[in-house]
Amino acid sequence: YHMRKIDEGQRIGISMQELTKHTFITGSTGSGKSNTVYKLLEKAKEKKIPFLVIEPAKGEYKDAVGKWEGVTTYGTNPKLEDEGIAMLRINPFRFPSETHILEHLDRLVEIFNVCWPMYAAMPAILKDAVERAYVSAGWDLEKSENKYGEQIYPTFADVVKQIKVVLDESEYSADNKGDYTGSLVTRLRSLTNGINGLIFTNDDIEDENLFDKQVIVDLSRVGSSETKSLIMGLLVLKLQEYRAEKRTKSDDELKHITVLEEAHNLLKRTSTEQVGEGANMIGKSVEMLANSIAEMRTYGEGFVIVDQSPGLLDMSVIRNTNTKIILRLPDFS
């Protein structure tokens, strides 16, 4: 469709190099989004370009792409390890040696701002607690070094303990302390038990195995939408830090493709003009995350953002993609 005319039989192509400028694919259910991505990944595999697919919803990629030779699938159900789907294991507190601890800490708190409803002093309390958790694990926040000489990192359980300390030392009213404790501690504690306790661990997958190979991360069995968003955000954060550390002078060429399916789980549309401190904070954090994705093109990273409706995504996400592939949409978006 061009200049209000339909040109039938036209072949339209896109060079793999264009993917470094990022791509947005949208269309309603059954319009061909997944098949379009399959074709992109097929061409990437032919050219030996590694890729990472993060799928939070239907679990189709593990069946369609996960069975290709050389593709590794990570999931969230330990029972599926016998079927060749390895357990996803992430350490949110680990960061590359070239990254300063305070850089990582700021980005980590921004991810929480996107994924959890945060208001009033909650982000400041969480950040203070995370800082204290790192210090208790032996980290010097200025030098970005561990006094024990080893890469020892805190856990969510450590952060829970520190939140209680921060609140006890604060001058908030009893009601506010109760609200903050109920909101922050309950969410953080939920990440230390059950399946979440198996996912968020110090015994995590090496970055090279996640970001330098052909990988599917299937989150379709995760029940909580907040946890899905958190895992997606942490993977993007770790990818950004890993690419920055491995950056070379010849980063103009495509080195890796990341596919974000159902991207609104992480990059949801939240106007920064909305009334309410929480909405305003989420909007700013989403925009910051979208800008981080846009900047990764300088590392040879190409993002493919996929969603059913453009209206669900923050406008900065769509604005930062060079190629738009628009399939059938039920309404004007």
Question: Can you say where each PLM-predicted feature lies in the sequence?
Answer:
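Short, glycine/polar-rich helix-capping loops at beta-to-alpha or helix-loop-helix junctions
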Residues: 60-63, 308-316
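The conserved Walker
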Residues: 25, 29, 310
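N-terminal pre-Walker A segment at the start of P-loop NTPase domains
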Residues: 1-12
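P-loop NTPase motor domains
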Residues: 41-294, 298-301
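Pre-Walker A (Motif I) flank of P-loop NTPase domains
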Residues: 10, 18-23, 212-215
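Conserved lysine of the Walker
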Residues: 33
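Hydrophobic positions on the alpha1 helix immediately C-terminal to the Walker A/P-loop
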Residues: 36
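A short helix-turn-beta junction within AAA+ P-loop NTPase domains corresponding to the substrate/partner-engaging
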Residues: 70-72, 316-328
